[in-house]
Amino acid sequence: MSASPPPSAGAAPPAVRVGVLLPRLPEEPADWLAECAAYDSAGADALWLDGGPDPAHDVLALAAALAAATGRARLVVALPDSVPQAALLARALATVVLLSGGRLALAADSRRCAELGAVAPTVPAFRRLAPAGPGYEEPGAGRWTPAAAPAGPDAWRTALAGAAERGVHGLVVPAGQRLLEALRLGVSAERHTRPNRPTRARVTTERQTTRRSS
């Protein structure tokens, strides 16, 4: 094989690309993402994500977060050695839980909810009610039911009030301009509470207060 010809006189040498070996994900993922975004904005050619042979977090989930936080650098992910599928899923879920600040929940049918509970017991799983009925059941909270997009603020208030009266915990509404406008107007921020029966402790307290005042 012939050698590459030497660069012509006066030609600039080829630029050396810079890859940044990222630190391990700390307890404050927002700071980590901000640091990664800073390297990207500063001109790094690649962000190198290597969690070692047995990483504490799922590197592909971290790469997804990096893809949203950065815009130009190549994302180089060192995949760990093969591990059981359940362990991969548990690690991925734990990573998203950390990145989201604990906001992650799952949705599945009853059988799948049981499986997910064994893999990730700290992640709540919304149980799909069909064919028993539309919507989902949130553990420890209540039922989420589908609802149509609001025709306007008044219709949205009526829908929220009706859901509260029926004991519905939440509504699942298709994305759209009407819903966006209702949310921007703060209509959904109005307090729509479900009727609750007084608890035994509350009844006892009320009776004690009445006796003291009499």
Which residue stretches match the model-derived regions?
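Structural motif corresponding to the early beta-alpha repeats
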Residues: 74-85
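Short, acidic/polar
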Residues: 26-39, 88-95, 152-163
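Substrate-binding cleft of secreted/luminal carbohydrate-active enzymes
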Residues: 163-185
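N-terminal beta1-alpha1-beta2 module of alpha/beta enzyme domains
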Residues: 1-70, 115-119, 175, 210
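C-terminal helical cap(s) of enzyme catalytic domains, especially alpha/beta-barrels
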Residues: 112-120, 177-214
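Internal, glycine-rich beta/alpha segment that forms the wall or movable "lid"
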Residues: 2-14, 85-150, 155-157
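Hydrophobic residues within beta-strands of alpha/beta enzymes
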Residues: 47, 75, 104-106, 171-174
